[in-house]
């Protein structure tokens, strides 16, 4: 028994109250000579056919082989004597009107068969049924205890349709519909087909246990329905099965969608899609296409396949970029391909990020190698050289580059490339801090470098004068880097203080200036050559003081000339004095005009780096000494007396590399002797020589 389901009552309980008065008690006795085998419960779907197999045996009593045997199937509560059977082989007996032509006794009771065929089962047919056999005069028996129950169920079974999974457009196809409920002697159902892919003549019904349909699909038939109908009864009981046609076609309707940081996907439209993302973001690219059979999907960056799918896999292919990098920029193409064709869609991905690795590339004259400089770098450049600064950074979109110097914007050398700054031959005014700015919507950076201008020594001096202790000389030089100064007396290097107290050297320095004063005590020998030399890595200069005529230098109150010179020398000096007075007056007028412009270049003898020098330098602004330099200041009423005023430049050259040895050049400049404390001695004179080596500014 099935729990919770109502079970049919036993035939004895149903038939006994009705049949007992009719049949008498004897007919209900269970005689072992009578037996019947039948299925206790027979299910049948409504409208279908079922065969109830049945076998019986009865005693050979009152009949022989020629005696006809009659069998009757009665519905429960029907009197065998007065009621109509639902099926019988007795032609003289009327059957129940509702079961006529549907219930048929197909078995031969004379041969021990009582099988029953039930066609087009109806809901009202559900009941108990028992069999009665009659043969001869004595066999009259109803098998009440061997009845069966006919269970009529709802029709849930559907036909099976056999069709290829994918139909080729333009190619004939055969479809079969089968309903697996066929019994021998049961009538065949009626089959029919409906669908958009079929012409009306294809929908005519046919009667069989299966149906075969042939047609030629077209691409338009894809995703349409095809239905097989199976009809079983005159009351319209039927079953049907619908299949969806899958006609092959090339990929179409390719769609790309994206999602940022695990957000919902956003579908993108356009022939070529442009997408901007920021560096470091999470990005998921999705690609889907409609095709039959399913297409193989792939993501391609440039010509490199990043991922692909199988036709039997998911219909959507995803590509995840975790922490997008700058190198992920490029054209991503989704391709969908099957045996009938292909389709693709492109996406241009631009990864945006602020300036990175900002640096300055430096190109200097006579150098083929570029230097990469970072922030805070000090850049030494030789005066007169050309300089090219290129600001370089990585960003997307490109950052806006600009140059400033001490906070003031510097115009680019090439407007089309604002990151390039070209400086003309470097001068002192170019010294300072240069800053490249890289401005970007996502952030900005800057890099600064300090430009220092280097140049070789510019010698000022030596200049000498008599003082109470002896001869006092001073020498100064300006250079970058700061120069070194040394004194030579003849071939002897003078450093510090002499142990005998014959000389004393006092050095000093301030910024680019180097100063040195020399005090000589005692008598000086004839053929005196006193030399001051300044040098740094870029070159050297030197100046010398000579004693022109032999004799002994003495400190006195005037300039005495030896009797050996005679009256001719006196006349010559008188002539020179007149000439000098005239020159000094002219030079003083010129000096006043140049004083304001040349105050920042102190020099007693005039800087060599000017490229030329006026013959008249006395009283000019360059007579101002450098910081810390020892000078002689004329007293009130004293006049400077010019004894020698000759200046020559020989073989001046442009800057040359420091490792190339340059020839020395001798120059002559003015010697000033103050009349208050003159140098005197028999036949004495002073001459200044400058030796320049290394490189000379243009």
From Swiss-Prot:
Binding site for N-acetylneuraminate: 132
Disulphides: 49-186, 54-114, 177-228, 287-334, 391-436
Major location category of this protein: membrane
Domain of life: Eukaryota
Molecular function GO terms recorded: carbohydrate binding; phosphatase binding; sialic acid binding
Signal peptide region: 1-27
Subcellular location as annotated: Membrane
Motif (ITIM motif): 642-647
Ig-like V-type domain ranges (all copies): 31-134
GO BP annotations listed: cell adhesion
Tissue specificity comment: Expressed by macrophages in various tissues including Kupffer cells. Also found in brain microglia.
Lipid bilayer topology: Single-pass type I membrane protein
Key word Signal present: yes
Intervals, Extracellular compartment: 28-561
Cytoplasmic side: 585-698
Region feature (Disordered): 596-635, 675-698
UniProt keywords, alphabetically: Cell adhesion, Disulfide bond, Glycoprotein, Immunoglobulin domain, Lectin, Membrane, Phosphoprotein, Repeat, Signal, Transmembrane, Transmembrane helix
Record comment regarding domains: Contains 1 copy of a cytoplasmic motif that is referred to as the immunoreceptor tyrosine-based inhibitor motif (ITIM). This motif is involved in modulation of cellular responses. The phosphorylated ITIM motif can bind the SH2 domain of several SH2-containing phosphatases.
PANTHER family, alphabetized: SIALIC ACID BINDING IMMUNOGLOBULIN-LIKE LECTIN (PTHR12035), SIALIC ACID-BINDING IG-LIKE LECTIN 11 (PTHR12035:SF127)
Function noted in UniProt: Putative adhesion molecule that mediates sialic-acid dependent binding to cells. Preferentially binds to alpha-2,8-linked sialic acid. The sialic acid recognition site may be masked by cis interactions with sialic acids on the same cell surface. In the immune response, may act as an inhibitory receptor upon ligand induced tyrosine phosphorylation by recruiting cytoplasmic phosphatase(s) via their SH2 domain(s) that block signal transduction through dephosphorylation of signaling molecules.
Subunit structure: Interacts with PTPN6/SHP-1 and PTPN11/SHP-2 upon phosphorylation.
Protein's name in the database: Sialic acid-binding Ig-like lectin 11
Source organism (scientific name): Homo sapiens (Human)
Lineage, highest ranks first: Eukaryota, Metazoa, Chordata, Craniata, Vertebrata
This protein's encoding gene: SIGLEC11
